[in-house]
Amino acid sequence: MSSQKTTTGLPTLSKSMIWMINFGFLGVQTAFTLQSSQMSRIFQTIGADPNNLGWFFLLPPLAGLIVQPIIGTYSDRTWAPKLGGRRLPYLLLGTIVAVIVMILLPNSGSFGFGYGSLAALWFGAITVAFLDLSSNVAMQPFKMMVGDMVNDDQKSYAYGIQSFLSNTGAVLAAIFPFLFTFLGVANTAKKGVVPQSVVVAFYVGAALLVITSLFTMLKVKEYDPATYALYHGIEEADNQKGESWLTLLKHAPKAFWTVTLVQFFCWFAFQYLWTYSAGAIAQNVWHTTNATSAAYQAAGNWYGVLAAVQSIAAVVWSYVLAKVPNQYHKLGYGGSLLIGATGFASIFFVHNQYVLILSYALVGIAWAGMNTYPLTIVTNALTGKHMGTYLGLFNGSICLPQIVASLASFALFPMLGGSQVNMFLLAGIVMLLGALSVTTIKETYVK
């Protein structure tokens, strides 16, 4: 690390250090994407009614809404050097729990509960809840460490690399079921049981989570409280003061709220992508709504490929966005979301599985923008005081839209004819509103 300081006092880090700070995000995102891309398939396979899928998809955002501000608040006040420092102890805890749950979740249909039984669905729901909780505990430290350790000049690059690694993990997660099927692992199973191709994918994802998280924990040395206070220009005791979340929100910079508006539309749209993709593809391309059929499972595998395409596009685009100068952030952000809106809407019209590759690539461009710019803009506007708490609270801009979308689906889904395909046209319109909302953002930098 260099001792050269920027206007905020933080030193300029080597690119290798920025990569090391973010490396564990590869494994965390692999776990998260396996859950989000396969959850609809798993629950419909064990007998969940498609009309009730919204209830299961309430669990991830609820977990994030509750857990991430708590992790932010407590990690602001934590210093445990033997466990890594300030944020890393929480990464360790989240990783341990997530690995255990990743082994249990794909086996939801293998414990003899019975197809469509309340016990099977409750087991799956509780397992997902724990995976969500642990994933959020493991995910938040990476976002906070960039805010803690990276200066304004490098922050866009750092979050761009985080997005790059995040999407690389998503690529791996998305192709695992397809890859293992290609290698001869069974992609079908008896009624109510999740295929082995999905089970093995979760096992491999768990191993990757352990390896990458350990890499970050062993390679990164967080700033001790005195050094942190010096670099951020605050008093060492500032982060120990117990200001309420409401008080902090009242004093949040304007950029916090304008980015939150954009986030609402973006995450609302993506909630429907995760909830309805497998069913929409099965309906539009394979012409089936029978979740136990081989055709439906083939559609589920193809969604895995499309999710990989989405993530590959996001990998490439996030690396491009990492190079965009600060003065063009809004153009890159709004343009990415506009392209994504086109991709969402196109899924409604497409009946060819290969044309869907283009649709999901466009969606991936929006995903890259969503994972690069919001945290860059918000952390640039924040001082070092209560950094973790603010980022935990900002996670509400991700979680609340998903909760609203899931609850709204109980009215919107029947209103749109009970068609999972129709939900994508709605998602495209909502994403367009997100792109237009970027014009409300005015970037500020702490001096």
Q: Regions from the language model: what does each represent?
A:
Residues 1-15, 109, 114-129, 137-138, ...:
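Intracellular loop-helix junctions on the cytosolic face of multi-pass helical membrane proteins
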Residues 5-63, 258, 262, 266-290:
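Helix-loop boundary and gating motifs at the non-cytosolic
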Residues 50-51, 152-162, 382-394:
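Loop-to-transmembrane helix entry/capping segments in MFS-fold secondary transporters
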Residues 66-83, 316-329, 413:
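Helix-to-loop junctions at the C-terminal end of transmembrane segments
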Residues 91-117, 339-351:
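C-terminal ends and interior cores of transmembrane alpha-helices
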Residues 137-150, 369-383:
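Intracellular juxtamembrane helix-capping segments at the cytosolic ends
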Residues 330-373:
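C-terminal transmembrane helical hairpin of 12-TM major facilitator-type secondary transporters
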Residues 384-416:
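A late C-terminal transmembrane helix in Major Facilitator Superfamily
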